[in-house]
Structures are given as C-alpha cells and as structure tokens.
Amino acid sequence: MDGYWDVVVSSLQDIYNANEVIPFDDELQTKKLNFLNMSKDQLQLHLNTFQEHMENVNRVHRILDNVRSNLSLMLNQSREEKSEENTEDAEEGEGTRMALSQGKKAVGKVGRSYWTSEYNPNAPILVGSEVAYKPRRGSADGEWIQCEVLKVVADGTRFEVRDPEPDELGNSGKVYKCNRKELLLIPPGFPTKNYPPGTKVLARYPETTTFYPAIVIGTKRDGTCRLRFDGEEEVDKETEVTRRLVLPSPTALANLARK
C-alpha cells in the first residue's frame, strides 16, 4: 500500500511542478489581445504558447487519473484486508483470537532476496513490498523501475510485480513476472548503513520512479545521500536522494543470498 501512496505523493508533486513551469490559470492579459493586428510571427508565438498550455493541462489530467486509480486501489486493498481479518476472527478459535489480540498475525508466502549486502539488509520480500525491478533488457546496472510486489509464487524465488506508473495513454501500469535476480528490495524504513564516498549505487532519480547508476559523493546528517548520476548533462551536478531509495549496485554486491 505504501507504494501506491508514494506514487500519489509523487504525482501531486508533478502537478505542482507543472503549474510552476506553465501556470494552469488563464492569463487575463491574453484575453485582451487583438490577434487581428498581429504579424504572422506574433501569432505563431502565441499559438505555441497555447499549445504548450494545452499539453500541460492534458498531462496533468492524465496524472490526476493515475492519482484516482492509485487511491482507489489503496481503498480496495484496505477493505479486502479488513474483510480478511473479520473472516479470520470468525473462523479461528479462542486461542487464535488471543494471539491476534497480542499482535500476532498470520503471514503469507515470503520471498527471498538474491542481492544483499551490509548496505541493503536481507529482509523478506512480501506482498506489498517495494522493489526495484530490472526489465529484461540491458545490463545489470541499466535502468530499474520501482514496483510493488503483487504476488509471491513458487518457493519464494519468483514474483509478480506492478509498475504503479500509468503508460503514455494513461492506462494502469504493467504487471511483470520475474525472478529474484531481477529485483532489489527497497528497505521498508528501518535504519540502514551509510555508503562511503565513491560507492557505486542505483538510485531513484527525483520526481521519477526510475533508478539509474550513480556515485555516492557524501551523506548528510539526516541520512540523505549526495549523488552524482551517470550521464548527467550538467558536469559535476550533485543530486540529493533519500537513503532508502539508494540501493547497492548489483555488480558491486559482494554477498549473495543463500538458497
């Protein structure tokens, strides 16, 4: 569920940024213009402005559709979990009810991480876990995308994950079938060790759900990583990324999860 909420927050930030670049509000001065007295170049300039404004508004409409979709999924998932809990309470005996009252809860299938190191704890992968998924193309340190685990199958080494971002047409994100070598677990929030400067990592680029190779420049007091992403157009540009969204590079990981 956290993955859906992260997408909602990220989408709302995208809408805010879109308004900062090209305000959604109508320009009063534009309404007062007399287009009949303008030259062809002036008309073309205004036409370009209107087209950019329209494209920006249409893009925001698609983002809002995605927000509504993710909020709906969150609400449905919450209802399903509540329904399952009520069913369990009705079917289980007094002993199970006592266990539940003490905070004990049955756990479904548990997935196992393949990639692990001192900078990315070997925590179990569960339904709802956030992961970085590598599409089956390119190198291990190519682009990875943030997904949410929908299903743990087989013996915990295969998964179904969903891209929470809609496609270019605004349709729901794709569902992928993958194995544990194609996933990197995003730490669920517990403390993680800081990377030393010079460490090669995969980090989620701000305002996207895509992970790219980067080099750690340093770490701030709050744990935020200062990074230099590979391929940045601006030379020596530093970017700050939340620690939990900075993952060890698969090619640099020394410890592999045991079967």
From Swiss-Prot:
Keywords, in A-Z order: Chromatin regulator, Nucleus, Phosphoprotein, Transcription, Transcription regulation
Region feature Histone H3K4me3 N-terminus binding, mapped onto this chain = 163-165, 207-210
Site note Histone H3K4me3 binding, residues:
Y205, Y212
Recorded GO molecular functions are:
methylated histone binding
- Residue ranges constituting the SGF29 C-terminal domain according to the UniProt record: 121-255
Localization terms from the record: Nucleus
Keyword Transcription tagged: yes
Residues annotated as region Histone H3K4me3 binding?
Answer: 229-232
Fill in the domain comment.
The SGF29 C-terminal (also named tudor-like) domain mediates binding to methylated 'Lys-4' of histone H3 (H3K4me).
Q: How does it assemble?
A: Component of the 1.8 MDa SAGA (Spt-Ada-Gcn5 acetyltransferase) complex, which is composed of 19 subunits TRA1, SPT7, TAF5, NGG1/ADA3, SGF73, SPT20/ADA5, SPT8, TAF12, TAF6, HFI1/ADA1, UBP8, GCN5, ADA2, SPT3, SGF29, TAF10, TAF9, SGF11 and SUS1.
- According to UniProt, the name of this protein is SAGA complex subunit SGF29
Organism for this UniProt entry: Saccharomyces cerevisiae (strain ATCC 204508 / S288c) (Baker's yeast)
Q: Which gene encodes it?
A: SGF29
